[in-house]
A protein has these predicted regions:
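Carbohydrate-recognition loop of C-type lectin domains
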Residues: 1-128
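An aromatic-glycine-centered, glycine-rich loop/turn in mixed alpha/beta architecture
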Residues: 87, 105-180
């Protein structure tokens, strides 16, 4: 009921919600993210503010502090107004580079598939070369093509620091950007 999984599931069931991230700070001090001591955080993409606030209210203990830039008033069954807080995600540009050997006529499809994979990652998710290549393979763009090597690397937009994996911050949703 009040656990993070229950809250997460309730948020994903809200009409229009496409992604969510739920976490907490169990410590007695403000943490490195700026979260209040003994508090919860909810980052929700999509859905109406009021519907999200009501879902959070139904699944949480109101004595636990919340972090957020969105504040919504929910009225409880006694007529008392309660403030529910949550965040909306920020878009994180994710630059990516693709190396295909030998060069392939499928490169446009491969790039589009990798961009779709990146864009499908949840708020605060992990983007990996392995999963990007699997998306390309599953789409049928590797079989029978003669491709012997496919490498995909990712970087936070504009940083130029490319790696085979990229962990997004808790409040970021990705948007893929091919860099050539």
């Amino acid at each position: 009921f009040w656990n993070l999984d229950g809250i997460y599931s309730e948020l994903l069931a809200v009409d229009g919600v496409t992604s969510a991230h739920v976490n907490c700070n169990r410590e007695n001090v403000v943490d490195s993210n700026g979260w209040l001591p003994h508090s919860r955080i909810y980052v929700v993409d999509g859905g109406a503010d009021k519907d999200i606030a009501e879902a959070i209210y139904r699944k949480t203990d109101r004595a636990i502090a919340e972090n957020g830039s969105v504040s919504v008033t929910v009225t409880d069954i006694q007529g008392i107004e309660r403030i529910v807080k949550f965040y909306r995600p920020e878009t994180q540009i994710v630059d990516f580079k693709v190396t295909v050997l030998p060069e392939s006529t499928n490169i446009t499809n491969i790039i589009a598939t990798i961009k779709s994979y990146i864009d499908s990652i949840s708020i605060g998710g992990l983007i990996t070369q392995t999963n990007a290549i699997e998306a390309v393979r599953s789409a049928g763009y590797l079989t029978g093509t003669g491709i012997q090597y496919l490498e995909v690397k990712f970087a936070l937009g504009g940083t130029g620091s490319y790696n085979p994996t990229l962990q997004l911050e808790y409040n970021k949703k990705p948007s893929g950007n091919l860099v050539t």
